[in-house]
Each structure stands twice: as C-alpha cells, then as structure tokens.
C-alpha cells in the first residue's frame, strides 16, 4: 500500500501504527534553524540561530519570544506557527494573572501548550503545528526548561537542542551538562553558544546579527539581550577544535540556508 493513503489527515493511522502528518510536522522542526536551551541552579539560557535573509534588504526572522516577565520561548520550524503559539501562551499568562494575581507556574504552561498541540492532531480538519518550542522560565520552584513537539509530548530538560543539525549540539551538551548546575551565568551562556555553534559547522556563522541570546532566572525577568549586550559573548567567538562534535555519518551535507524552513516565502 502507498503511504499517501494514510497521510491525508491526522486521524488516519497507517497499518504500522504511524501518523504521517505528525511525522511531517516533526520534519519541519528538524529542518528549522537550531535553538539551544541550558539551565543551572538559578538561570535558564536560550540561544537561537536566526534564518539568513533571502535578500540583502530583508530582516532576520525572530526566533525568541517573551511570553511573560518570568517565561519566554525559542522556536524551530514554521515561524508563523511559533508566533501563533506565542500569542496563545501570552493570553493564558494574562488570564492566570487576572484570576490568581500571580505568575502562571511553568509546569502548567508546558501542560497547556502540550494540550494545544494535541488538539490539532486529534480531530480531522486541522493540521499539526509545524514548530517545536523550548520554553524557559523561573518560578517559585526554580528554573525550568521544557521542550514541546508537534505530537503534543512535553519534556523537562536540563539542557537540549532542536532544529537542523541539533544532534551535534546535543552531543556537546551531553559532554558538559554535569557542570552546568554550579557554573555562573556567563559560563552557561558560553556553553549554550558553543552548543549552537556545534550545529552550525563550528561557529563560523555566529554573530550579533543572526544569533539571539535570552536569559531568565532568580531576580532576573526574561530578557532578550540587545546587540550591545550580546557583543560581549559573540565578538571574537571561537570554537576550540576539541569542542566540535563529529558530524553524524547519516547527516546530509546540505547547508542551513538550503534546508531551513523558517522564512515564509
């Protein structure tokens, strides 16, 4: 039987128990430009590579969004879907603050986002969201980093990456994450940048124009660093050869600009 008999909507299972529409949405995330999240005992850091503009006079697509004073997110995949989910979470945070006069707890935000994803794959007539989120925030229980995917699954991480060539970034994080709880904020930012650089051929592409850095933590509301603040970390940024993970054998040799789905054309 041909696969296209089972991929016309999200409510049709294949004979092998697969939902092809959800798998296609996951591929949109995997082909988006990379994003990395890492946390220590007091802070969470997000770094994201913004898509190269299609023309010299066009701007970069934003990849990191502030959702509330205590939470924000980075995206990989279809930017329009990410913006819609950002508006949805902002509304949920405002409603919670109106009802309870306090910040929306991070586990509840992650659960609400997962349910939003799941509703789009449970009924015919809707398509899955083609975007993955890294949700970073700080509440009364400490720092949190969640990863959501088009299937509706929500994962709680100490550090992770998503997007194109993210396996190389995860390999770097796996080698260093045990030192994250006790490292300072500046060191944590550098680790996140090195992981992002590992997903971009050793960091040659990282600069203040195409790289976003965001932080949130104890006594620090969620903020996206300005170009001047980010310059401290990105000017002269270099990856040591020993920090560059070997590329997976099966990874295709296409460039980020060729495969990224972040720009709407």
Swiss-Prot record:
GO terms for biological process: ubiquitin-dependent protein catabolic process. Residues 256-265 have a biased composition (Basic and acidic residues). GO terms for cellular component: cytoplasm; nucleus; proteasome core complex, alpha-subunit complex. It is found in: Cytoplasm; Nucleus. It comes from the Eukaryota. Gene3D superfamilies: Glutamine Phosphoribosylpyrophosphate, subunit 1, domain 1. The keyword Cytoplasm applies. Belongs to the peptidase T1A family. The 26S proteasome consists of a 20S proteasome core and two 19S regulatory subunits. The 20S proteasome core is composed of 28 subunits that are arranged in four stacked rings, resulting in a barrel-shaped structure. The two end rings are each formed by seven alpha subunits, and the two central rings are each formed by seven beta subunits. The catalytic chamber with the active sites is on the inside of the barrel. This is Proteasome subunit alpha type-1. It comes from Trypanosoma cruzi. The lineage of its organism: Eukaryota, Discoba, Euglenozoa, Kinetoplastea, Metakinetoplastina.
């Amino acid at each position: 039987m041909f696969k296209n008999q089972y991929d016309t909507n999200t409510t049709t299972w294949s004979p092998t128990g697969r939902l092809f529409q959800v798998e296609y949405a996951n591929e949109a995330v995997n082909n988006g430009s990379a994003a990395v999240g890492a946390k220590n005992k007091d802070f969470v850091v997000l770094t994201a590579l913004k898509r190269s503009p299609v023309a010299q006079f066009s701007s970069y697509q934003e990849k990191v969004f502030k959702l509330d004073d205590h939470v924000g997110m980075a995206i990989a995949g279809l930017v329009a879907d990410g913006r819609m989910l950002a508006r949805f979470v902002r509304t949920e945070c405002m409603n919670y603050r109106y009802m309870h006069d306090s910040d929306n707890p991070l586990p509840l935000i992650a659960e609400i986002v997962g349910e939003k994803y799941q509703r789009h794959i449970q009924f015919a007539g809707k398509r899955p969201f083609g975007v993955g989120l890294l949700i970073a925030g700080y509440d009364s229980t400490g720092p949190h980093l969640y990863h959501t995917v088009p299937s509706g699954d929500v994962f709680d991480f100490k550090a992770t990456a998503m997007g194109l060539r993210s396996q190389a970034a995860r390999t770097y994080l796996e080698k260093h994450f045990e030192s994250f709880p006790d490292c300072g904020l500046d060191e944590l930012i550098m680790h996140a940048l090195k992981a992002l650089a590992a997903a971009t051929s050793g960091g040659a592409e990282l600069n203040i124009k195409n790289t976003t850095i965001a932080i949130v933590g104890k006594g620090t509301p969620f903020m996206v660093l300005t170009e001047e603040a980010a310059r401290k970390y990105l000017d002269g940024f270099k990856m040591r050869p020993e920090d560059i993970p070997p590329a997976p054998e099966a990874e295709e040799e296409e460039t980020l600009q060729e495969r990224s789905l972040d720009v709407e054309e």
